Amino acid sequence: MILLWYILIPAAAAPGAWLLGRARPGLARWTAVVGTAAPLALLVGQWLASAGTLRAALAARGPGAAGLVEGAWLAHVRVPWIAPLGIDFFLAEDGLTIIVLALTFGLGLLAVLASWRGITERVGFFHFMILWTVAALAGVFLSFDLFLFYFFFEMMLIPMYFVIAVWGHERRVYAAIKFFLFTQASGLLMLVAIVALYFIHGRATGDYTFGFTELLGTRMSSTTAFLLMLGFFAAFAVKLPVVPVHTWLPDAHTEAPTAGSVILAGVLIKIGAYGMIRFMVPLFPQAVHDFRTPAMILAVIGIIYGAVMAYGQRDLKRLVAYTSVSHMGFVLLGIFAWNTLALQGVLLQLVCHAFSTGALFIMVGGLQDRIHTRDMDRMGGLWQVAPRMGGTAMFFALASLGLPGLGNFVAEFLILIGTWQVSEWAAVLGAAGLVFATVYALWMMQRAFQGEETHGWSFADLTKREVGMFAALIAALVAIGFYPQPLITTSRQTVASLERMTAASGLAARPQAATPPAGAAAIDPAAAADNTAGAGAGTSNDTSAGTSVAPFGGGGQ
């Protein structure tokens, strides 16, 4: 039942915010705060209560891949919805779900706080759309029925379209339509793949269902599997986004209001990575294995292209948007490396990118509200005018380039080490992208905040509300940088189940022999990442499943 509340609380708060906002805009804002903070508090409580379960070694609930998936669940609910078509209201939660749900509610709350003074028209309707988006995103991350997943996947497009089109900037309608068309067209390809998988499984087994656990291991030809995998990949590649289907993202970010950019960067594009990890790879492991090299090429292109394009921007917000293209290239690289270190790095990257890039979008939005421009040619020396803003911007710029000691460094380090195990050339080229990240991050600071102030700007520094938001994000990035173990332990069972269920395809194979000698202890793939606590220290990936782990992973052997 608790899983339903994660969807129902923001969904119920949405019309409340709209109605209350018609009388008093302040009530709409506070309703939105409650609608995002309440499920976040509920989730944190569940996370703390489930600490022992998350630390335990993975135990499959049944035979095969489905048993491995179910073994990592913390909670689930499944009731018939459209029974004649085999559609169930099927929600489940594991460590991966906890992480992405926390991002959804946390970034949703930040989006509301960041818009506290910036949104002055149709305030109630605005917060209705934000809460609708949050509820739909929660549904996406909890769904284990592919039809239900697609339902929520499409449902979130509508409120985000209105957020951009109604409250965006000069070219907001163009950006909103482009965002909608890209996502809708690619989503239809995924729908075709889902329906095809439904009929293939039904004809083979007599069980027509959209249930994810039943569809695992569906028998089909390699050509069919590859084509269906491409249908899923198209939808998730657009969301991530992957070059060359990324062009909607800079426009959407540039024209969206601050809240829209925070949700886009912090949560919405993470659906692409989540969908690949949760559905695409487990359903079509051999096809993904065959597609590994082209995908890694696209990932490396995205890393370098996004960084180079960021360097060439005059618009500060568009620069930050292109950094997301580069950072998500690392995510794609880690997904197709598909080993413990890479996958744990991907999950850390999703979190740290959400915090650092979300903070930069809040910073840019606040700056635009003060000086009414995003053109860096009209900036320079702003640190002298607003030193707290300048220092905060420097911190998040350093986080974005992967400064050691911050969470982004740990994430990229794990991804590159994991990638090296399967593809040395991809790891080397991906590491080269970090050099470009340094260039665009420091160039941004030089053009906007350093140098002499020659334009006569005079504006207020960060407010207490802004300082509070940035302080929370800074603390989170520093904490993850020095002690990422809570996140690693939270996701270790999910990573273990994913790696084991795809092992037969060779996707999760290591360069070393994977079969232990007779009488040796079984290897727990998830335990490998337990030695990565600290700022990237320790990368052993051969740890006994019997290793004793202190609360939330403190002290592996």
Place the predicted regions along the sequence by residue.
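Predominantly late transmembrane helices and immediately cytosolic-facing juxtamembrane segments
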Residues: 243, 357-361, 426-460
